[in-house]
Amino acid sequence: MARWSGQIMCFRVGHFLLVGHFLLVGNFLLTDDSDTFSFVALGGGREVGRSCHVISFKGKTIMLDAGVHPAHSGLASLPFYDEFDLSTIDILLISHFHLDHAASLPYVMQKTNFKGRVFMTHPTKGIYRWLLSDFVRVTSGAESDPDLYSEADLTASFNKIETIDYHSTMEVNGVKFTAYHAGHVLGAAMYTIEVGGVKVLFTGDYSREEDRHLNQAEVPPMKPDILICESTYGTGTHLPRLEREQRLTGLIHSTLDKGGKCLLPVFALGRAQEILLILDEYWEAHPDLQEFSIYYASALAKKCIAVYQTYINMMNDNIRRRFRDQKTNPFRFKYIKNIKNLDRFDDMGPCVMVASPGMLQSGVSRSLLERWAPDPKNTLILTGYSVEGTMAKQIINEPNEIPSAQNPDLKVPRRLAVEELSFAAHVDFQQNSEFIDLVDSKNIILVHGELNNMQRLKAALLAKYRGLKNSPREKTIYNPRNCEEVELAFKGVKVAKTVGKMAEEKPHVGQIISGVVVQKDFNYGLMGVADLREHVGLSTSSVLERQTVTVNAGVDLVKYHLEQMFGYVEMRETENVKIEEMEDDVAEEEEDKEVKQEVEDVTMEGEVKDETAEEVKKEEEVAEEFKQEVEGDSDTSAGTTFVVMNSVTVKHTPTSCTIEWVGSCLNDSIADAVLAILLTVDNSRASVKMSSKQCAHSHGHEDGHSNSSLDERVLQLSSILKAQFGDSYIVSEDGKSANIKIDAMEATISFSDLSVTGSPPPLVQRVQVAVDRAISLVAPLAQKLSAVDLVEGFKAIENVKDREENGEVKAEDEEKVKAEEKVKEEE
């Protein structure tokens, strides 16, 4: 299985990333260094409210939720957006429509440099528009805090939001994400996200208990590497659903019997519909209560009920069965009256009021609280989670007085009863722990929980998984604060699929294959250059570069300097094509003349045309001048060509050298080196020394830089191994192998394929490394000497030895000497 080696060079073309040329051996498996997954909580870290988390991996950035803090207002309620560059975010996923998860989305989309795409489920988008419109109405006009955004900003952001169906997978720039049912509220979703092979599960707010209209949260089929999980209730435990409902209806029934009023602060959407279903069914079963009115006070009451009536098919079997069998819509309540405000509310006698907002910070629920607080017959039932810093959290402690919303200095006496009965549809410890077991993720990041609850949950989980420590299933748990970064290292292993002509040929182990790796998002393809247009849509071209420099040096000097740098330079003679062509033309012309002359001689019946000696001499002079002219012109066309590293050609003429190469990073580097050498040939001291003559005549000298023959290299290889291992290196009698024996350890080198066998493995590995290094040492830089060449060299040496023993070599040498003497005599 091959790994990448060497230096990676890449450049981007459109959506594709071309990763140079690489050599791969065996299977095409890409491995790279550790990649870091980053998680930052801009909100919702060790707190409940303004949920906003950012994950980054492999150059992709995803934001999860964009809410506000219900205990604050204005800019103070926003997540810490200033701590992150929002322009780098590719995708923003909204889990559900609650204000602490979605209310700052218009601010992000319209007031910042955010450029990504936003996704949420269809019901969430349907409710988002009306819920945030009410949020703008309630929060606008405050003198102390500027408005976060306007109605126009909300409308503009709404038009940019895209929707996703449950169980459908979408892909954006290589990031895949899928929505699953999360329970909690209508349209709530948990998301599985896959980025560069790393799988993440973000639960958002979720419930593992089926209620009257929603299914419980699903367990995604994939096993995530990272779980981002809510910790709202920490280690707390909920009452069973039926017991909670009985206690709720019992409290309401007893309050009405004693002539009091019941106030149930809720969010306008979500848990309010669940409570209304419970109350409507209870009133149907108890005719004695039907004289008391149930009010649902919300400016969005009718609009929101219409949304719930629209998305019945996304609810549980109970609601769909009632809709199918009874032919009625369960959300068309029989005993519940909708009111937008308190202007026409007849505050006389016992009643039940379900009013928003749920945190009692302002609005109808806060007004009624201050109005009903002094009467001990009244009851306040908190059905949702109370966030730290809100009136709902404060009144749980049952203070004697509460401040007025309009004038905090004005105190209102509290005499009404306060009961907390959670219908918040969040998981308790048992449900959360079971879900974490089913998901079975090694890395768990806790969010959306107050500090104490989150720390208790972390401690409980660590105690539960203590037995998995130092095992493959060991779990790591994080509970970061806001703006604290969590980094997790993942080693990515990616497979490059061969396509095109390269995929048609089945490679064998050990084969070297050259191609281009093309990356699109997180997918890799290995193909030949010729297949780029067909499979990727990219056109290719080769740039032939040429440069001519003045070089006043002969062929020998140029060859000498190139060999000093590159070790081996292939030399090719450039034939004088011009002279040969002209001589051929002259020969053909003369042949035509002879044929023509023969024809004339036949037709003239033996007549012979006399030519004077002067005319013959004149023609000979013209031919001689023509020949000299041709030979003079041949100096510019004849020359020598050198090939350096099989990539750069150097055409040498008496006055210049022309360098040609196909443009690439490697070829450009070689060409630069060749050019630098040619520019220094003239003034090099070595050139002066070599070109000077110690005698008046010119003759050849021994070339000290000539390339060694194959036989010499084979002997050099054996000498290197002998020097490395000393007396332990012994060549076998047949010369086909060599043994290296050190104490009880022994390794054998086979000269047939230059393989090493023996034991123990460390010795075999060391000997193999020595053989490989020796092979690379006996050949020049530019000439690759394969094991096959060396094996042939060994065979040639053995053949010569055998022939010497048989006397064949001596006879051949004598015949060769006689042949040379005969040639000299003939000369």
From Swiss-Prot:
Signal peptide: none annotated. Zn(2+) 2 binds at D100, H101, D205, H448. GO terms for cellular component: mRNA cleavage and polyadenylation specificity factor complex. The active site is at H426 (proton donor). Zn(2+) 1 binds at H96, H98, H184, D205. One of its GO terms (biological process) is mRNA processing. The keyword Secreted does not apply. Belongs to the metallo-beta-lactamase superfamily. RNA-metabolizing metallo-beta-lactamase-like family. CPSF2/YSH1 subfamily. Component of the cleavage factor I (CF I) involved in pre-mRNA 3'-end processing. This is Endoribonuclease YSH1. It comes from Yarrowia lipolytica (strain CLIB 122 / E 150). The lineage of its organism: Eukaryota, Fungi, Dikarya, Ascomycota, Saccharomycotina. The gene is YSH1.
